[in-house]
Amino acid sequence: MTLSFHTGGYLMKTLIVVDMQTDFIDGALGSKEATKIVSNVVKKIKKYVKNGDRVIFTQDTHKKNYMKTREGKYLPVPHCIKGSDGWMIPSKIRNAAPEDTLVIEKPAFGYTGWKSILKADKDPVELIGLCTDICVVSNALAIKNTFPERDVAVDSSCCAGVSPASHDAALLTMKCCQIDILNEGKEPWRE
């Protein structure tokens, strides 16, 4: 399936790269599935940059008191502590986009400021990254709820979940909410 857009053209597509950080790739909460999507993510970012489209990174950002937070009680694994190596977006990924690319630090699964970032235009949005079943789905649904007429897609070949089963469940949830799923079944970690 290719990402299709409503007729009438658009000014610019936006790629949102969700939480592609060391702790989620091969750090505290990393997985073999996450490591296997990195090259697809880099290729996708470079394609958007080459086409003159917009790239935005999100960065899961916690404070040193993470273990005392609600999330820390339910997921007692310190991760993405601001300034730590695990919080960083690996240079291979970060350097695929221009230096002045917007990076949104978010303290929760979903970002609540999409309305001010994406404005009211109808340009399509595509999301990729980690974890499909937590932050990718949270942000895709937040964008779809804020902009119900906007084309929103997730490229599953550039995503990995906490587990393959939870990744698939998140894709189903997003499909039910009219979010287009691209490359389903073509995730590199399925090979």
Give the label of every model feature segment.
Residues 60, 109, 157-159:
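Active-site beta-loop-alpha junctions enriched in small/polar residues
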Residues 33, 113, 135-136, 162-163:
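Secondary-structure boundary/capping motif
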Residues 126-130, 149-164, 184:
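A short glycine-rich beta-strand->turn/loop micro-motif centered on a GG-aromatic cluster
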Residues 19, 133, 157:
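Acidic active-site catalytic centers that drive phospho-/nucleotidyl reactions
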Residues 5-103, 153, 162, 168-176, ...:
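Active-site acidic carboxylates
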Residues 83-134:
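Internal catalytic-core helix/loop-beta-alpha segment
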